[in-house]
Amino acid sequence: LRKWPVLIVVLIMGLVLAGCGNSGGKTAGTSTGGNEAGKQEVIKVAADTTFPPFEMEVNGKVTGFDIDLINAIAAKENLKVQMQTMDFQGLIPALQTDTVDVAVAGITITPQRAQMVNFSNPYYHSGLSILVKKDSNIKGVSDLKGKTVAVKLGTTGDIMMSKMPGVNVKRFNNIDDAYNELQNGGAQAVLFDNPVNQNYINTGHNNVKVVGGLLTGEDYGIAVTKQKPELLKKINDGLARLMASGEYEQLYRKYFKSDDSGLIKK
C-alpha cells in the first residue's frame, strides 16, 4: 500500500512533463512558421551618388529616381533595402563577389556587362551626348579629334572615347569633377549620359550646351548578382507591377517632368 502514493506522484509528474513538452513544441513551431512567412528578405543595394537626378546625396540622404524606384519595387515584393554607396567602377566587381545583391546607378545594359551580372528589364531609355561651353566651335563627335574630352571612369562614354583616335581623354571618378574640368578650361568637352548633362544645364549652369544630339541609344537596367536569379525575377515582377499600376510613370514625372525621352512605355 505504501507504494501507491509513490506511483501516483510519478504518474502525475510524467503527465505534467509530457504536457509541457507537447505544448512547448507546438508553440515554437507556430511562432517560427509565422515569422518566416512575414519576414522581409534583406537585399544589399549599392548606388553611385554622383549621378543626378538618378542618384544623389542631399543633406546626408541618398535620393533620386533610381533610389525611389528600387524602394518601390522592394515594397511590391516584400524586400527590405539595405543601401550603401560606392564609386561606379566598383559596382560590378561588388556584384561579382556577392558584396552586394543589387546595383542602381543608371547602368547601361551592354553585352559585356551582361556576361558579368544579370540585368532587369529596361527602366529608362538614354544615350550619350556632348556637353561644351556655349562659345565652343564643337558641333559633333567628329570635332572631338585633337580635343581634350572629360569622361567618368568606366562608363560607356569612357569606352567610346577610348576607341576614338586623336582624342585626349581625361577620366574622373566623379562626373562633377569632369564638369569642373570643362568649366576651368582643362577640357573642351564632356561626354556623358544625356539626362545627366541636361540636369547639369538645368541646375544653374547656363554657360554650357549639348551639341550633336544623342550619339547612342542605351537602356538602363537594375544590375543583379548572377548568384540570385530568383531575386532578378522579383525585381522584374515588381517593376512590371509598377508599370501596370502607373506608379512607375508617377516616379518618372517627379524627376523628368514632361520630358518623355527616357520613359519606357508598355
Locate each region found by the language model.
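Short helix-initiation/N-cap motifs at beta->coil->alpha
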Residues: 83-95, 136, 153-156, 170-184, ...
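Ligand-binding clefts/hinges and TM-proximal coupling segments of bilobed small-molecule sensing domains
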Residues: 22-28, 159-173, 209-212, 239-266
